[in-house]
Curated annotation (Swiss-Prot):
Protein's UniProt name: ATPase WRNIP1
Protein function: Functions as a modulator for initiation or reinitiation events during DNA polymerase delta-mediated DNA synthesis. Has an intrinsic ATPase activity that functions as a sensor of DNA damage or of arrested replication forks and regulates the extent of DNA synthesis.
Encoding gene (name): wrnip1
Biased composition (Basic and acidic residues): 850-863
Provenance organism: Dictyostelium discoideum
Membership in a protein family: Belongs to the AAA ATPase family. RarA/MGS1/WRNIP1 subfamily.
Primary location group: nucleus
Pfam family, one: AAA_assoc_2
Length: 876
């Protein structure tokens, strides 16, 4: 226990300092002065504000020893005398602080004595004699214990440091004055080390407020309202960190009202009533009261109702701030008395401006100069996600982390320095590390963010946007949403928005729910995403949901007629006697369901419609195919439109050739018609077998008529080469999708074995298109060739020149009186190919093949017992 004396406090303090300096106490390893009664850190004296006051008071009283002539002042004991042990003051033992390495005990004594000199010099400015005595005593003690005289060195170092510190103070003071003039929240700045940086950065003027341009700039009425001295009751609603509390404090400070602030987290009905009572008393003196309630949504219904009478009577002006939707969390009666202003989260540009301002004022607020590059600033603004408090707290943590890296000695020097030491801290994106990681997404179960996210997911699925669907699902899962809730909502989507358009959607959603239930997070994420994307890509139909709502509305407006008798169940004999189930037609007993004539609705509403299936949106796959097809057709149309109207010279030549071929076709048709008419006249009196041949000739005539009609259509559109080619192919019964060789039936006109008598009459051919030399007594015909030579009755050679046009050969679809076994050979190697003509009982053929075009005509007649017709097959 320490000993107590009756001397006054000033004497105790001064004697304490004298005792510590004269007894040559030793500084231990932890940096403390030790004696028998106490352990005390000499650097902690300045932390005690009461000790400061006592020290200064004692310094003023010490002037008695300097020949003070004031007789009314009581005599004080001489503080320079060596105190007795009874004058020692004992202090409670202080907790040990982190240690730092001491050079040696002798130097420690010197440093401690020098520190005592500095303390006495700073605190006893009015008593120079006492300071000199103390310095002498300290120096004597140092010499006696260590034999070292550091007085000269200490004085020199102190002088140099004071000069440097004075220059630093001048520069810092000038910078501080500029900052205080620039920002209103620094005007009455008082450094509070315990306040977080975000609180110290809170603006006090609307000119310094960042963000909410739509509210403060876009709406001038609201801005004037906030700046006016007369305020209504209003609620500020917005996400965290957007400036609700700051704006409310700025607006309240501009009015002439008393301001009372409460937080709904730690207050209740009692606190509200106390504020209302005080406001009622001040109102009697003509001054109103503003009650600001932060997080007002935390109040329950009863607590909110307490505010209603005071607001309605004008006793208080309520300003509330909330992060939850007021329409859900606040009473309707309270909302009717307060205007709600919705605030948006800060933009990335707003946060970058705020971060740069924070970097500018931190030298004044925290004795640190933060230096950040643009990349780090943009990354921090991105991670903050509209929350100003998050951005400033990251900077605050970076500064505090830098302080932890300092040694104990550096912290003590900085703490007790009056020079305003400012240290530079360079912060890069890499150095901040995990501080730039997003800790959480905006998500509050049961709040606005929760319902907004699930609404966005549902509408993305309905709109068949798989990309957006995946984003919202993953964001909800990463925000901490219950996965079972998400799949329950997807079950609803499968029946509401997809329905009958894809009957596998609902079973898949139920399977996803079971998978989540069995597996759990995080393994179930793939199952949830798979189901969500499938629902987004599926076809859509809301027929079930639409007609359910329609029928429900109908039932609310109309009475319900009874169930028809034939549809009622009759499990008992009595009910059967009543006629229940009579005349019911069991559908499975009818093979033809059209025989079922019963109706299934009551008679009054049998014509009402209560369901009709409608496909509102096809699947993504079907739409993609349709879009591709539409795109291809549009490209073809564009190509046709972009083609020049004037054709090139090769195209014009091709068109002229086609027109010539059409003219040749007309001439060939005339020849065929004449030959057919002659054959009909000759065969009119022949046998029944020949009559069948006559019928076939009539069919040929019909085909020729069709060819003539087609040619007439071609003549009307002879300017379009593509259409002409198409009609020519159609007239020759050609299909480009089929193989090249097509068959056209043309029976032989004459039978060489049985009808030799008629050869001389029929072998007359019409006027040839081009002259050809043909030498044979049974064949006198001309086709579009330059030279045809028939050697004998068994074989003939047909030679074509190089300028032979194979398109014209298609017109010679009928060659009469070809001898049996005759061969037709083409001499041109590049264009033709030789084939033998074989004669059988039912078929004769002539084949002429070209590398560019293959035109084939053939015919097979039914066998006739007496005189079967001999078909001729022309293969081109």
């Amino acid at each position: 226990m320490s000993k107590k004396t009756n001397i006054n406090t000033n004497t105790k303090i001064n004697n304490f300092f004298q005792t510590k300096t004269n007894n040559a106490n030793v500084v231990n390893e932890k940096g403390y002065i030790e004696d028998d009664n106490e352990i005390i850190d000499i650097n902690d004296f300045e932390e005690d504000q009461n000790l400061y006051k006592i020290q200064n008071k004692s310094n003023g009283n010490n002037s008695i020893n300097n020949n003070n002539n004031n007789k009314n002042t009581p005599t004080k004991p001489n503080l320079n005398l060596t105190p007795t042990k009874s004058h020692t003051i004992s202090f409670p033992t202080r907790p040990k602080l982190p240690s730092f390495t001491q050079p040696n005990n002798n130097n420690n004594n010197n440093n401690n004595n020098n520190n005592n000199n500095n303390i006495n010099n700073n605190n006893n400015n009015n008593n120079n004699n006492n300071n000199n005595n103390n310095n002498n005593n300290n120096n004597n003690n140092n010499n006696s214990s260590t034999n070292v005289k550091p007085t000269t060195t200490t004085t020199t170092t102190t002088t140099i440091n004071n000069n440097n510190n004075n220059n630093n103070n001048n520069n810092i003071n000038n910078n501080n004055i500029d900052l205080k003039n620039k920002y209103s929240f620094l005007t009455n700045f008082k450094k509070k080390s315990f306040a977080p940086l975000s609180e110290q950065m809170r603006p006090t003027e609307l000119s310094d407020f960042i963000g909410q341009e739509s509210l403060l700039v876009g709406d001038p009425i609201v801005k004037k309202l906030f700046q006016s001295p007369e305020l209504p009751s209003f609620i500020l609603y917005g996400p965290p960190g957007c400036g609700k509390t700051t704006l409310a404090q700025i607006v309240a400070s501009k009015s002439n009202y008393n301001i009372n602030a409460l937080s709904a987290v730690g207050s209740g009905v009692k606190d509200i009533k106390e504020v209302i009572d005080k406001a009622r008393n001040t109102l009697q003196f003509g001054k109103k009261t503003i009650l600001f309630i932060d997080e007002i949504h935390r109040y329950n219904k009863l607590q909110q109702d307490v505010l209603l009478p005071a607001i309605e009577s004008g006793i208080i002006i309520l300003i509330g701030a909330t992060t939850e939707n007021p329409s859900f969390e606040l009473n309707g009666a309270l909302l009717s008395r307060c205007k709600v202003f919705k605030m948006e989260k800060l933009t990335k540009e707003n946060l970058e401006t705020l971060i740069k301002r924070t970097l500018e004022v931190t030298p004044l607020l925290m004795d640190r100069r933060l230096i950040m590059d643009e990349d780090a600033i943009k990354s921090l603004a991105e991670i903050a996600d509209g929350d100003a408090r998050v951005a400033i707290n990251v900077l605050d943590m970076a500064i505090k982390a830098n302080k932890e890296e300092q040694t104990y000695k550096e912290r003590m020097e900085e703490k007790h320095s009056t020079s305003g030491i400012v240290r530079d801290i360079v912060l890069t994106k890499k150095q901040m590390g995990s501080l730039l990681q997003r800790t959480s997404l905006i998500y509050d179960k049961g709040g606005d963010a929760f319902y907004e996210l699930i609404s966005a997911l549902h509408k993305s699925v309905r709109g068949s946007d798989a990309n957006a669907t995946a984003y919202w699902v993953i964001r909800m899962l990463e925000s901490g949403c219950e996965p079972l809730y998400i799949v329950r909502r997807m079950v609803r989507m499968a029946s509401e928005d997809i329905g009958l358009a894809d009957n596998s959607a609902l079973p898949l959603a139920i399977a996803a729910y079971q998978a989540v239930h069995f597996v759990g997070m995080p393994e179930c994420t793939n199952a949830i995403l798979q189901c969500a994307v499938y629902l987004a890509n599926a076809a859509k139909s809301n027929s079930c949901d639409h007609w359910y709502a329609h029928t429900r509305e109908y039932l609310e407006k109309h009475e319900g007629p009874p169930v028809p008798i034939h549809l009622r169940n009759a499990p008992t004999k009595m009910m059967k006697d009543w006629g229940y189930g009579a005349d019911y037609q069991y559908n499975h007993a009818f093979d033809d369901q059209s025989q079922v004539t019963q109706i299934y609705l009551p008679e009054p509403i049998k014509n009402e419609k209560f369901f009709e299936y409608k496909l509102t949106c096809p699947s993504v796959k079907d739409r993609q195919q349709s879009q591709d097809q539409t795109q291809r057709s549009s490209q073809q149309q564009q190509q046709q439109q972009t083609q020049p109207q004037q054709q090139t010279q090769p195209q014009q030549q091709t068109q002229q050739q086609i027109q010539q071929q059409l003219e040749q076709l007309k001439q060939i048709q005339q020849q065929l018609e004449q030959q057919v008419q002659q054959q009909i006249q000759q065969q009119s009196s022949q046998s029944p077998s020949q009559q069948s041949q006559l019928q076939e000739l009539q069919q040929i005539q019909q085909q020729l008529q069709q060819i003539q009609q087609t040619n007439s259509q071609i003549n009307n559109k002879n300017n379009d080469s593509n259409i002409i080619k198409k009609n020519v192919n159609n007239s020759l019964d050609l299909n480009p999708t089929l193989p090249k060789k097509q068959k056209m039936i043309i029976p032989s006109i004459l039978d060489n074995s049985n009808n030799n008598n008629n050869n001389n009459n029929i072998n007359k051919s019409p006027t040839p298109i081009k002259k050809a030399n043909i030498s044979h007594n049974q064949l006198d015909s001309s086709i579009n060739t330059s030279a045809i030579t028939i050697d004998d009755s068994s074989e003939c050679d047909i030679n074509f020149d190089d300028d032979f046009d194979m398109a014209s050969v298609s017109s010679t679809t009928m060659i009469s009186n070809i001898p049996v076994g005759a061969n037709v050979a083409g001499a041109t190697e590049a264009e033709t190919e030789t084939k033998a003509i074989s004669s059988t009982d039912t078929k004769e053929s002539v084949s002429i093949n070209d590398s560019d075009k293959d035109l084939t005509t053939t015919h097979k007649n039914e066998q006739d017992q007496n005189n079967p017709p001999d078909p001729i097959s022309l293969d081109f």
